[in-house]
Amino acid sequence: MLEIAGKKFDSHLIMGTGGATSQTLLEKALVASGTQLTTVAMRRFRAGNTPSTAGASNGAAGGESVFGLLNRLGIDVLPNTAGCRTAKDAILTAQLAREALGTNWVKLELIADDRTLLPDVVELVDTCEMLVANGFEVLAYTSDDPVVAKRLEDAGAAAVMPLGSPIGTGLGILNPHNIELICARASVPVLLDAGVGTTSDAALAMELGCSGVLLASAVNRCQDPVAMATAMRHAVEAGRLAAAAGRIPKRTHAQGALASSSFEGLASWDEDWAEEVL
């Protein structure tokens, strides 16, 4: 069970909508993933929509919007501040989300570099603190720096979301040691966000101690999004179960230089018998 800010989810997989080639394919992938929480950029929202009436604004002309789709599927919306570069922009975007969608949850993204989409950790902590003071539950997208993650937690973040690698790269978890450190020290959920390329990345995140995984490109930009969404669902669950089971220690050789099975009961060489036969 994934619990964030007092709300419980059966699924530990959070999906994103960016990069989907069609609304129909997005819907099938979301259902296949089993997700119960999906993030959407507020820049896709148009005035006049509500979660239940967001009919034709953001999809094809005359079609259902992504907000309407999520509402119909019973998936909670996690609005994000993608594209914001300053605290002012992020706070205004969060306020828009609260007014338009009726939620005080926000995924805080402050981008420092348009090419890499890496987060601005200098602005991030202060912005998080201001949003929390204004009644928001902040899920903060951050670097894989354990110090920054801890400062976000101290600022009141409901969850910290360190990247595995830059958004959309599919490079996986480049610094597993740091992710493991963040998880070990955090008292709020740690959600791996960005860089997942395939199922092994998602499973590893859970094995390192993450409470959940957020991904978009790995599913929405692959050759078969529905199949990959299904695979990611199982990968996250497998990683979670493996972490709970506890892996064996890593060693340079077998413990005590002995094989894992006893030699008891195995056939032995009898010299006297061998002489008679030979």
From Swiss-Prot:
GO terms for biological process: thiamine diphosphate biosynthetic process. 1-deoxy-D-xylulose 5-phosphate binds at residues 168, 194-195, 216-217. Its EC number is 2.8.1.10. One of its GO terms (molecular function) is thiazole synthase activity. Its main location: cytoplasm. The active site is at 107 (schiff-base intermediate with dxp). Pathway: Cofactor biosynthesis; thiamine diphosphate biosynthesis. It holds the Pfam family ThiG. InterPro entries: Aldolase_TIM, Thiazole_synthase_ThiG, ThiG. GO terms for cellular component: cytoplasm. It catalyses: [ThiS sulfur-carrier protein]-C-terminal-Gly-aminoethanethioate + 2-iminoacetate + 1-deoxy-D-xylulose 5-phosphate = [ThiS sulfur-carrier protein]-C-terminal Gly-Gly + 2-[(2R,5Z)-2-carboxy-4-methylthiazol-5(2H)-ylidene]ethyl phosphate + 2 H2O + H(+). It is found in: Cytoplasm. The keyword Transferase applies. SUPFAM superfamilies: ThiG-like (SSF110399). Keywords: Cytoplasm, Schiff base, Thiamine biosynthesis, Transferase. Catalyzes the rearrangement of 1-deoxy-D-xylulose 5-phosphate (DXP) to produce the thiazole phosphate moiety of thiamine. Sulfur is provided by the thiocarboxylate moiety of the carrier protein ThiS. In vitro, sulfur can be provided by H(2)S. Homotetramer. Forms heterodimers with either ThiH or ThiS. Belongs to the ThiG family. This is Thiazole synthase. The gene is thiG.
